[in-house]
């Protein structure tokens, strides 16, 4: 760049100016190495350059003349001026001491500053005083970076600015896509003004016709009503015109900002780094404004005025003074567009920016190290650990949601006449582009007053102090289980009493003695009870004659009094040894170079945490307390005396007679058969639910956040490939990653862009024979690849017509090769043949049966050919036949079994069970083919078997369930 020589010249001039100052007036961080060398060449006695430097036996050096003056010729010794050590003078005198050849060599160097050597010396001093870049850690000319506020070298600053420009390009494209909302709202306001004028004219005609019969008596009343209508018309016209003008100003501001940024990105005009950063923040806020901009058409454009004669029309002569009223008809549910709607949506609707992620990368690493240290220290302490950032974000989201629902319930009915004002949350918020324009116009002329039209601002939202924060998912789940099991009597579990509370010392000695006596007695009783229990357990273990079988098909670990916020430790078995080791939770990832033992001694790049399956658990070491418990149960079950009594013929006969009497006295034969069928069905359903709950322990967990091979950044769609492989959409890395059944990285394909074979935030994934179908969200198309990642063809485009998409999400393929696509923002499902030719479509926006609201994922049954669609924003699953005819729906919003909160991925196993990713509730739910709830597993968290924003699910050929744990950036296999 042309400014580089100028910057170097300024740096040299600054250095010369610092060197000309005395050392005391220089900055503390400036060092002249030549002055340090000069200090080393100065004699500490005469404070001048060494003259014939002599080295004493104590390794201190002085000038020969100085040593002559310090020598004691009478006693022939010399005391070192530095360390006061006494040395004998040689026979030949002080000159016989060893010369310091090193200092002599330095003194012989001629350091005269000539015009040729001055530049080299200045360059040397300049390099010596260079700072280290805070990013690449190299010495260079560092200046504050406008992006990250850290001193960085030129290359790192340029890298940051390039990253910022890429983010600005993406923001620019999104703003252009969403800009039509303001234009449409402005056009609708113009139509609303015309419709409102027509409505008012019609109302005037009705009023005139009604009051013409009572012209003389009701003339005054008529004038009053007409005046009210005119006032209403003027007020509404003024409000709507003002709002339209505001929207037009918003549109012009946005267009100006877009054109200015577009010119800056294309290089048509120069722009400062700080201005670019400010514009990036402005566009980020503007994009948030456009996302939340959803004007209520009924509230703004369809407010109708209607004249009502009243119920006392027959008594009009007597009630002429109180007859008639004007009513403003506000459509029902006019306030259904909540301003907080976007605040508690799942994170996939908020894509992080590359520059923001890079900006806080080092801070995140430091905070992760701090959290790791906090977790380690909390394991050894008795205090509850602090809630992490994710749990705080979860509670905040729940709090915002509860607040929005309370405001919706408590909202009043239609506002009264002439006191209402047009309030639209999405329209009344101040746009960032307007603020940007005001800032630019005020900066040149600060003294000139500026009048602005400021829309209504939102009042600050307050949370009632009496409202309790929502419970974490673990505690909520426990409450549900307790409520479900409340009708049945629960066995009384032994509860360990807490220790007596420590009281503060008082000045009353007698009271302190009593308290201490009570404390000692309580401690003695506890010690005695522990000793007795240990003696009983030791006697039981010594007198045991029955072997305990440890070869169990499944191990159930019961956690007693576990803290909700604790880190779940995982158990993993070392193959061939039969010993169990504690594996840290997957969020504490191992370094990339650490070897992972998974049955073979291979070294992989990404940690893959394997868990003991159900096949080989014969060598698992059972804890002592669990072994004693099983021994007691085994002993009571195999006691020969009790066994003989209960297996005798007489006892069995009495039991059979009692059962027959009960059956004959209460039921008929048909009822007996029904009861038997119901019992068998209940036992089967209970057994099936138990088997599904037992699968909540993952077999393997792999992946972590990053962009390297095997790393993931917001994984979304997933599908099973032939050969036991699994493919997933690495959404924020704009690629598809393929892993084997053990979690080892195999290959990847795709890449960021809009060209052939490139992707922009891939979401859905499906496989058919030798092809992989990927939904390319922001390119609004479907891309078809071969199994090896070679691009075959693409189809689609942005729009609302047939074969056009608006943010396509999930894809599915049936046995005939037909491709089903969930067209999310068009609220429909489109069907294509295997070559991408349009066949049919079904679904429309709404909440009625057969309508969809942001459909996300699709699954097609291979047996019934039914199409299952996750109707996400309606919190349900909609089922269609192959022709698009709606059959039924199941599910509703909630957190109980069978209820959903933004459901996403759907998979169908070999038994036609539906496995659904309940994203908002962070769990997997299982239903039968008729939509009846079977079981669920999973909860919120970062441990094994825990989920954060589960996205998609698939079933492999061996029956394993593979889940994309989106916000944990990993894959879990159950």
Curated annotation (Swiss-Prot):
InterPro entries attached to this UniProt entry: 6-blade_b-propeller_TolB-like, NHL_repeat, TRIM-NHL_E3_ligases, Znf_C3HC4_RING-type, Znf_RING, Znf_RING/FYVE/PHD, Znf_RING_CS
Feature: compositional bias, Low complexity: 529-538
Family annotation (PROSITE patterns): NHL, ZF_RING_1, ZF_RING_2
Keywords: Metal-binding, Repeat, Zinc, Zinc-finger
Comp. bias (Pro residues): 488-501
Record-linked SUPFAM superfamilies: NHL repeat, RING/U-box
GO molecular function: ubiquitin protein ligase activity; ubiquitin-protein transferase activity; zinc ion binding
Zinc finger (RING-type): 43-84
Pfam family, one: zf-C3HC4
Signal peptide (residue range): none
Region (Disordered): 1-29, 360-395, 416-548
Transmembrane spans: none
Effect of disrupting the coding gene: Double knockout with par-2 mutant (it5ts) partially suppresses the lethality phenotype of the par-2 mutant (it5ts) at 25 degrees Celsius.
CDD domains associated with the record: NHL_TRIM71_like, RING-HC_NHL-1-like
GO biological process: proteasome-mediated ubiquitin-dependent protein catabolic process; protein polyubiquitination; protein ubiquitination
Biased composition (Basic and acidic residues): 9-19, 437-446, 511-528
Extent of the NHL repeats: 699-742, 746-788, 792-835, 839-883, 887-930, 934-974
Compositionally skewed regions (Polar residues) per UniProt: 416-431, 447-465
Assembly: Interacts with ubc-13.
Protein name: RING finger protein nhl-1
Source species: Caenorhabditis elegans
Gene name per UniProt: nhl-1
């Amino acid at each position: 760049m042309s400014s580089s020589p100028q910057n170097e010249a300024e740096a040299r001039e600054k250095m010369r100016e610092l060197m000309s100052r005395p050392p005391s007036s220089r900055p503390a961080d400036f060092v002249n190495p030549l002055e340090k060398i000069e200090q080393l060449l100065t004699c500490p006695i005469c404070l001048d350059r060494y003259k014939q430097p002599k080295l004493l036996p104590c390794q201190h050096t002085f000038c020969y003349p100085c040593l002559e003056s310090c020598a004691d010729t009478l006693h022939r010794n010399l005391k070192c001026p530095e360390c006061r050590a006494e040395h004998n003078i040689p026979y030949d005198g002080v000159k016989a001491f060893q010369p310091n050849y090193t200092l002599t060599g330095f003194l012989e160097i001629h350091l005269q500053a000539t015009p040729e050597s001055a530049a080299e010396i200045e360059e040397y001093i300049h390099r010596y005083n260079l700072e280290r870049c805070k990013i690449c850690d190299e010495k260079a000319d560092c200046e504050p970076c406008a992006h990250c506020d850290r001193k960085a070298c030129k290359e790192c600053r340029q890298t940051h600015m390039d990253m910022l420009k890429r983010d600005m390009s993406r923001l620019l494209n999104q703003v252009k896509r969403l800009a039509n909302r303001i234009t449409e709202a402005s056009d609708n306001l113009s139509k609303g003004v015309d419709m409102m004028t027509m409505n008012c004219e019609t109302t005037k005609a009705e009023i005139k016709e009604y009051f013409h019969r009572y012209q003389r008596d009701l003339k005054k009343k008529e004038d009053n009503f007409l005046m009210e209508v005119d006032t209403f018309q003027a007020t509404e016209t003024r409000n709507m015109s003002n709002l339209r003008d505001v929207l037009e100003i918003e549109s012009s501001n946005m267009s100006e900002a877009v054109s200015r940024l577009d010119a800056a990105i294309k290089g048509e005009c120069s722009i400062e780094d700080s201005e670019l950063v400010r514009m990036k923040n402005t566009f980020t806020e503007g994009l948030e404004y456009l996302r939340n901009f959803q004007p209520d058409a009924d509230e703004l454009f369809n407010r109708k005025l209607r004249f009502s004669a009243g119920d006392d029309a027959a008594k009009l002569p007597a009630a002429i003074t109180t007859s008639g009223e004007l009513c403003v008809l506000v459509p029902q549910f006019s306030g259904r567009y909540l301003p907080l709607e976007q605040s508690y949506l799942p994170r996939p609707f908020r894509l992080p920016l590359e520059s923001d992620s890079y900006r806080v990368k080092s801070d995140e690493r430091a905070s992760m190290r701090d959290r790791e240290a906090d977790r380690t220290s909390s394991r050894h302490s008795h205090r509850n650990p602090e809630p992490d950032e994710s749990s705080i974000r979860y509670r905040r989201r729940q709090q915002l949601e509860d607040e929005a629902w309370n405001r919706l319930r408590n909202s009043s009915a239609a506002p009264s006449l002439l006191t209402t004002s047009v309030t639209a949350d999405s329209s009344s918020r101040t746009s960032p582009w307007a603020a940007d324009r005001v800032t630019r116009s005020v900066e040149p002329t600060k003294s000139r007053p500026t009048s602005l039209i400021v829309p209504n601002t939102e009042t600050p939202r307050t949370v009632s102090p009496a409202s309790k924060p929502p419970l974490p998912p673990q505690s909520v789940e426990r409450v549900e289980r307790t409520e479900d099991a409340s009708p049945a009597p629960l066995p009384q579990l032994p509860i360990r009493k807490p220790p007596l509370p420590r009281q503060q010392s008082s000045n009353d000695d007698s009271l302190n003695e009593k308290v201490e006596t009570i404390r000692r007695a309580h401690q003695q009783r506890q010690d005695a009870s522990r000793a007795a229990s240990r003696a009983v357990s030791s006697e039981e273990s010594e007198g045991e004659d029955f072997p305990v079988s440890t070869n169990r098909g499944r191990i159930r670990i019961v956690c007693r009094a576990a803290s909700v916020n604790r880190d779940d430790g995982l158990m993993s078995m070392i193959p061939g040894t039969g010993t169990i080791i504690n594996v840290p939770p997957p969020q504490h990832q191992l370094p990339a170079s650490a070897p992972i033992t998974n049955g073979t001694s291979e070294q992989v790049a990404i940690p893959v945490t394997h868990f003991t399956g159900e096949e080989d658990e014969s060598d698992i070491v059972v804890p002592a307390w669990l072994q004693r418990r099983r021994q007691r149960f085994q002993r009571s079950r195999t006691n020969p005396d009790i066994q003989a009594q209960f297996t005798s013929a007489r006892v069995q006969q009495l039991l059979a007679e009692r059962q027959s009497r009960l059956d004959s006295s209460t039921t008929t034969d048909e009822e007996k058969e029904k009861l038997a069928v119901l019992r068998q069905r209940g036992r089967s359903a209970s057994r099936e639910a138990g088997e599904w709950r037992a699968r909540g322990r993952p077999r393997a967990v792999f992946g972590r956040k990053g962009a390297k091979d095997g790393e993931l950044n917001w994984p979304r769609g997933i599908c099973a490939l032939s050969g036991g492989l699994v493919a997933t959409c690495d959404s924020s890395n704009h690629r598809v990653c393929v892993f084997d059944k053990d979690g080892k990285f195999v290959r990847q394909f795709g890449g960021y862009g809009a060209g052939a074979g490139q992707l922009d935030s891939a979401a859905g994934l499906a496989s058919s024979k030798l092809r992989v179908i990927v939904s390319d969200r922001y390119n609004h198309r479907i891309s078809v690849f071969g199994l090896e990642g070679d691009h075959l063809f693409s189809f689609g485009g942005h729009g609302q017509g047939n074969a056009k998409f608006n943010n396509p999400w999930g894809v599915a393929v049936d046995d005939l090769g037909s491709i089903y696509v969930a067209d999310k923002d068009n609220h429909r499902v489109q069907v294509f043949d295997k070559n991408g030719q349009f066949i049919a479509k079904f679904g429309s926006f709404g909440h009625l049966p057969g309508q969809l609201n942001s459909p996300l994922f699709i699954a097609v049954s291979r047996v019934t050919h039914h199409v299952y669609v996750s109707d996400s924003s309606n919190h349900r699953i909609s089922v269609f036949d192959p022709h698009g005819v709606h059959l039924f729906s199941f599910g509703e919003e909630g957190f109980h079994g069978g209820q959903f909160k933004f459901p996403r991925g759907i998979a169908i196993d070999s038994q036609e069970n539906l496995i659904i990713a309940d994203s908002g509730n962070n769990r997997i739910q299982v239903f039968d083919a008729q939509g009846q709830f079977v079981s669920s597993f999973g909860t919120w968290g970062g441990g094994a078997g825990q989920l954060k924003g589960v996205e998609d699910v698939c079933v492999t050929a061996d029956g394993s369930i593979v889940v994309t744990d989106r916000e944990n950036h990993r894959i879990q296999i159950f």
